[in-house]
Design a protein with these regions (language model features):
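Hydrophobic, aromatic-lined core segments that form the binding pocket/scaffold
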Residues: 1-134
């Protein structure tokens, strides 16, 4: 993500905050945080929708929005990789926000995270190209 063009002034500091929250205490703390976040998501619904469904719908969006573009550049794998990587990044950002808020995450916060990520990725042809060729 640090190879992307930063479109908003605070995007890099947002990435740094997420990185510190998730990985700052080491690998074992990261695994414990992810375990607790998974348990939280298994019990919690966000505006009536489970986290699995949210992530699935985001994957459908990324595939639907970009897969057909492979007709022009023959980069089918890149389009799918970008979809998978985007879901992974968003999940990590959700976990970081949840941890920063002492185990709380709302549907509105999920929306904000997805919106900000989408703005950084999709409003730059350079960023789309980088994500499709990682």
């Amino acid at each position: 993500l640090y190879e992307l063009e930063f479109l908003s002034e605070d995007w890099e500091s947002n990435l740094n905050r997420c990185k510190q929250t998730l990985y700052g205490e080491g690998i074992e703390a990261y695994h414990e945080l992810q375990k607790r976040f998974q348990e939280y998501c298994a019990q919690e619904c966000f505006a009536g929708v489970s986290m699995d469904i949210i992530l699935e719908q985001l994957a459908v969006y990324f595939v639907f929005a970009y897969f057909c573009g492979a007709v022009y550049d023959d980069n089918v794998i890149g389009k799918i990789r970008m979809a998978v990587d985007s879901i992974t990044v968003l999940h990590e950002m959700f976990a970081a926000k949840w941890a920063e808020q002492d185990g709380s995450l709302s549907a509105k916060e999920i929306q904000k995270i997805v919106y900000r990520y989408s703005r950084e990725l999709e409003h730059s042809d350079l960023n789309l190209e980088v994500m499709q060729n990682v």
